[in-house]
Design a protein with these regions (language model features):
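Conserved, well-structured core domains of diverse proteins
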Residues: 15-138, 144-148
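Hydrophobic transmembrane alpha-helices of multi-pass solute/ion transporters
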Residues: 70-75, 100-105, 131-224
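Short linear sequence motifs
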Residues: 2-7, 54, 73, 84, ...
Length: 224
């Protein structure tokens, strides 16, 4: 999932900011490269605005300007904000399947876009509580439900952007903590419940918020 976010930002940055300087006759249609939709009107500006907002937030975070400290003061909150700005766009840019429209955003993708934005927004809003109250180990019931929802939306986003085989690999790998006691010796471990696994994926620094996302948010965006 973290590598997916890396791919998305590079696409948004170079697809939303730089094409204005590229001659039309030399630019390849995006759908021929990655199967994305040809957005028009309002939806065309959604990834562009998200890219600009992420750039400004990253500048504030990397240079410790504290101009928008309510987002960048807590590191995990900044990471959740990166996810919140990128993950929902998958449902706008990548169709559900090959038969779906490549020029219009259907109603179900609009709902998924809004739902994913709301799910990610929940973690942005509660990032400080997650740290202070140790939700990674004992989260309230409603946070457990939202953790399952984030888990599901990420696997579906991987399927759309990376294909079904990669989604299957990611999905099976994400279930590992549940069956850790059943795998061969070298990778065997103590099992976790599905609820603990969902919380682990959503709130720990070892899964969605792991090293790939941290390196991406701290280094890759700044470099670009």
């Amino acid at each position: 999932p973290d590598l997916l976010l890396d791919h998305l930002f590079v696409h948004f940055y170079f697809g939303a900011v730089l094409p204005m300087n590229v001659p039309q006759e030399t630019a390849s249609p995006p759908e021929n490269i990655s199967g994305i939709r040809q957005l028009t009107g309002f939806w065309l500006w959604v990834p562009r605005v998200a890219t600009v907002v992420m750039t400004l937030i990253t500048i504030d975070y990397l240079f410790n300007l504290q101009l928008i400290g309510f987002i960048t003061q807590v590191e995990s909150q900044f990471f959740y904000m990166v996810v919140a700005l990128m993950l929902p766009l998958v449902y706008v840019l990548w169709p559900m399947n090959k038969h779906a429209s490549r020029t219009q955003v259907p109603w179900y993708d609009v709902l998924l876009f809004l739902a994913t934005a709301g799910i990610c927004g929940f973690f942005v809003y509660n990032a400080e509580q997650i740290l202070d109250r140790g939700w990674e180990y004992e989260a309230p019931q409603y946070a457990m439900v939202v953790s399952f929802m984030l888990w599901a939306t990420i696997v579906e986003a991987v399927r759309r952007a990376g294909g079904l085989p990669i989604a299957i690999i990611v999905g099976i790998a994400s279930l590992y903590p549940i069956f850790a006691d059943l795998v061969p010796g070298p990778i065997q471990g103590f099992p976790s419940s599905p609820t603990q696994t969902a919380i682990y994926h959503a709130m720990s620094r070892e899964s969605i918020m792991g090293i790939p996302l941290q390196a991406f948010a701290n280094l890759v965006i700044g470099f670009l």
